[in-house]
């Protein structure tokens, strides 16, 4: 059996290794939850054997040594970490320790904040002017990132207002909103650059660039949460008061900071934030709970690496470790070959996960993934679980290479990867059963032709029995033929036939979207329909003419042009029209002639609406001369935010785009 000393040495060595990967290399190998577990194990052993605690134990310090590439800044006041709790019982025990240690009947109130998942920084202002900025580093010495911090627009270079201290060190978190993270990775995949595993890594990598011009291109932002050095001035005597003073001086503070009068209110805040977490637009991994009174904070003091007056109440882990048992390849409706990791099932954020996307061959190469590897799985909100990284230090000896197919796993056709694209595709087209199934499922979906009752299992059977080859074949189905399918009685079969008949009456935009042209989503389909008005005009359009449609670039224009240039596609369209698919004659809208607050504006809808469906809202906006887009960009004029608006709202706020709610939208629609 291992001695206690040997266990402590191994735990400290392991933790130091992972601290170095996390804080210095920005390349964590294990989930935060696993690091926390190892730290708890070490702390418990040291508590039982205090005589074995060493000054350099990870429990006695914060972080790791700074990179040599940056000059160093010594923190005048150490930047400490926080202790963690993971359940209500542990928080209530912390609450009791605070009450007992104060030894008075004085009421304790709590200032609660979001625990942002970014990079802790210290920013020094002298006479209100930003003079330096540093990372946390090892808590005593950090890296000088002044030039990079100056590029972050959320951080003021000069404070404004009155009574600004002569020297004020503000502490906070630099982080990357989800929309910005997705854009960085999207660009990286397109250009062959570095793809980041999560927003925290992307924020750290962006902030620690040796070239500030690169940092300036990254949409980093910042919230402050504390103070270090304070000279030649005064601050309020409560933590919340200080944050509000920071805000008055122009420093960004989260609008979710909340004062709680009791432990029960703290728990209610925790659960409210946990519920809202998927729609915040940026990553958090818990809430931070601080004694609000500065006098009480001073009474409580510090332990070696953390204050006694604050704690991080962490959410259930969104990352876990498991093993890759196999890698299979799925074929989508456009022929895209997507590798999927088959995992040893593991619970992540309350959900049992057994599969995770690997995106493409480049991602497998970037990860260095082999079948049999131990990997970190991440699941955030409704995002499909993905492999974040491989735990190389625990790679088994019997792992196998992942071999990307050269032929379609479904139909055997050649797999082709166009130069400059990350995705490999099956060249089989509609002879490929997988593409045929997915194309038909898309065609009948609610936002396309909206064929009620035509579910995935029915489509699967229709393709497997060779009843249907193209979308036009759907409209030739009879109740008798449908009755031969599993779980399909005469009544259900007739209902499907009736739904197909009803679906023949559609709109030009829906019809275009249903065709499944590559990279033509609802918004693009609506734009094409509004611009060209008729199918004949669209079919005849050149690539140059197609690019005149708002938000249609060379890539989408080429996909549309190539689709209509293909004779088999034109034949399917002719068959659909012959089967009776039709839509109203176009109403040509000239935005300049419409007297409407939306005329000529590019509008984005986000979140859920309570008074009308999103489709109805889109249709009404288009009638009033708006161009409804699917994503927020610098070209967006207005964002309409419903309930639970997420990353699109965050991006709009980041870009300074006008935002209105559903009530204001309805008022303007009525005007």
From Swiss-Prot:
Annotated residues for binding of Zn(2+): 408, 411, 426, 432
GO biological process per UniProt: DNA repair; DNA replication
Active site: 115
GO CC annotations, alphabetized: cytosol
Residues noted as binding NAD(+) in the record, renumbered to the chain: 32-36, 81-82, 113, 136, 173, 290, 314
Pfam family, one: HHH_2
Cofactor list: Mg(2+); Mn(2+)
Keyword entries, A-Z: DNA damage, DNA repair, DNA replication, Ligase, Magnesium, Manganese, Metal-binding, NAD, Zinc
Keyword Manganese among record annotations: yes
GO MF annotation, one: DNA ligase (NAD+) activity
Keyword Cytoplasm included in the entry's annotation: no
Catalytic activity: NAD(+) + (deoxyribonucleotide)n-3'-hydroxyl + 5'-phospho-(deoxyribonucleotide)m = (deoxyribonucleotide)n+m + AMP + beta-nicotinamide D-nucleotide
EC number(s) recorded for this UniProt protein: 6.5.1.2
Taxonomy, superkingdom: Bacteria
Segments forming domain BRCT: 593-671
Protein family membership: Belongs to the NAD-dependent DNA ligase family. LigA subfamily.
Main function: DNA ligase that catalyzes the formation of phosphodiester linkages between 5'-phosphoryl and 3'-hydroxyl groups in double-stranded DNA using NAD as a coenzyme and as the energy source for the reaction. It is essential for DNA replication and repair of damaged DNA.
Descriptive protein name: DNA ligase
Natural source organism: Escherichia coli O127:H6 (strain E2348/69 / EPEC)
Gene: ligA
